[in-house]
């Protein structure tokens, strides 16, 4: 309750300081979505995207992002793109991606620190968009861990089911896994359904 009141007062008296976090497992499309938001409203990207897991290993923040709703409302927030959360980071997965052993071990160490930092940053979040890959099993241990941490902190959540442009995408499975949350299917890469996503952000933050 104390965390909830802290976030409520911060939104009430300092709306420009509202923090919207993008959380999710590695390679779910968090940075792709962050780049889509920043390009749509600021004309520039936020971070680098890669097919190799844990490309984002440090928290990245873009301040003063202002979006507009269909009915003309404006919402300003600080967008926080976090490293992918994993229950285990093994340097061997980077070896399989073709990295030299020394670089793979360094990447694994950085990725582990990134996971810890992501969890720490949760206490500063006013709202969170959990970005899930709609082509993968939503009942994974890491997804349950992320949702559990958010529930424990009473942080408002919307789920973005990403990659719905792919044939294997299964929105119904995600909806069945997390019926307590609003879920919007998007393709961050191609911008599919992105306007509906922005409307969800307005509802999430309560603007």
Label each region the model flagged.
Residues 1-98:
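Conserved G1/Walker A P-loop phosphate-binding module
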Residues 19, 163-207:
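Canonical P-loop GTPase G-domain recognition
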Residues 28, 57, 141, 169, ...:
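Charged, alpha-helix-enriched surfaces in structured cytosolic catalytic cores
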Residues 36-37, 92-95, 143-147, 172-176, ...:
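Short, glycine/charged-enriched secondary-structure capping and boundary segments
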Residues 55, 84-86, 135-137, 163-167, ...:
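Conserved nucleotide-binding/hydrolysis micro-motifs of P-loop NTPases
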Residues 88-115:
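Charged, glycine/proline-rich intrinsically disordered loops and linkers
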Residues 106-181:
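Conserved C-terminal guanine-recognition region of P-loop GTPase G domains, centered on the G4
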């Amino acid at each position: 309750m104390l965390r909830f009141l802290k976030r409520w007062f911060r939104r009430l008296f300092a709306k420009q300081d509202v923090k919207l976090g993008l959380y999710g497992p590695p390679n779910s499309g968090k940075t792709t979505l962050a780049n889509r938001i920043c390009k749509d409203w600021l004309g520039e990207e936020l971070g680098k995207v890669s097919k190799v897991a844990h490309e984002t290993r440090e928290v990245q923040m873009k301040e003063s992002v202002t979006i507009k709703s269909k009915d003309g409302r404006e919402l300003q927030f600080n967008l926080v793109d976090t490293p992918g959360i994993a229950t285990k980071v093994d340097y061997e997965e980077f070896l399989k991606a073709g990295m030299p052993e020394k670089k793979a071990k360094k990447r694994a160490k950085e990725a582990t620190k990134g996971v810890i930092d992501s969890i720490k940053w949760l206490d500063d979040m006013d709202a969170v968009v959990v970005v899930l890959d709609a082509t993968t099993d939503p009942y994974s241990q890491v997804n349950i861990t992320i949702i559990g941490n958010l529930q424990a902190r009473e942080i408002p959540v919307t789920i973005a089911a990403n990659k719905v442009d792919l044939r294997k995408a299964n929105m119904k499975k995600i909806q069945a896994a997390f019926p307590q949350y609003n879920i919007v299917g998007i393709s961050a890469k191609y911008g599919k359904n992105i306007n509906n996503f922005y409307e969800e952000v307005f509802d999430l933050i309560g603007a």
